[in-house]
Amino acid sequence: MRECLYFLAGVTSSGKSALAMSWAASQNAEILSCDSIALYRGMDLGAAKPSAEDRKRIPHHGLDLAEVTEGFDVSKYERYAQRVVSEVVSRGKKLLVVGGSGFYLQSFFEPIVDEVVVTDEIREQVENLYESKGIEGLLDQLGELNQGEPLGLDELNPRRLLRALERCLGSGLKLSQLRERFESMPVPYASFAKQCLWLDRENEDLEARIESRTVKMIEMGLVEETETLIERGFLANPAACSSVGYRDVCSYLRNEITRDELIPAICTSTRKLVSKQRKWFRKRFPSSSRNLIGPNKESRSDELNWSSGT
């Protein structure tokens, strides 16, 4: 019988953390956070990390892995997760992967990181090209390196073009060759069965929960936490300082919005994130795995609809 990995995804404020605790306790399982912000030390309130008490009750992984000044991308998370899966399974326990960061979740289901090495010199070369010649400069060099083949990229998205050019230069290959090589990579965790579910709520109920959560974060000291993070060099990490909640507090601290505008701004940012999360979950998980929780209710671990994942 194959070992099984369990995946609990959910939009922000859906109640997945409470459900994860309940399910893990009932199954003698451990929890692996799949959140691109919770992995940073000091980003506690905005990431809604589990309390110290919860972390004592149930072993948690994937939290507080890096300083806010460090770069921590999906490739590092992927390697870390592989170690956690191996260790937890070796102890004969179940593992519940919990989160809402789509790209990080994706690393459990399909290859997302290839072996192209991009040196600092290449990165600087590409950035200088973009600064001097803009998108047109990137497209010209990509066209030359790819011998006129269609790029298959959003040609108005500079970030995508920058990364594509870096990978072409780092590998010496065309994008079509890189894609072919990437598609031949093995499926992650192919030896495991995978059971998935994702939590969601009706919009009106979710809106109320988002507002309540935001008010609570501010009352507990999100502004002060952000000030401390800034002192520690947080602004040098774009992924961290542009995340929902923290980005809005930074705007407030720069006097771009007022205190009265802060909570509505965070709520608006959170709703946009929820929309992105839903799109990803619909694409990745079968519709049968969606668990829609009714208003003013909490999900119960014995009433879940798990579906097989691939």
Predicted features along the sequence, with ranges:
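Phosphate/pyrophosphate-binding catalytic cores of soluble transferases and nucleic-acid-acting enzymes
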Residues: M1-T310
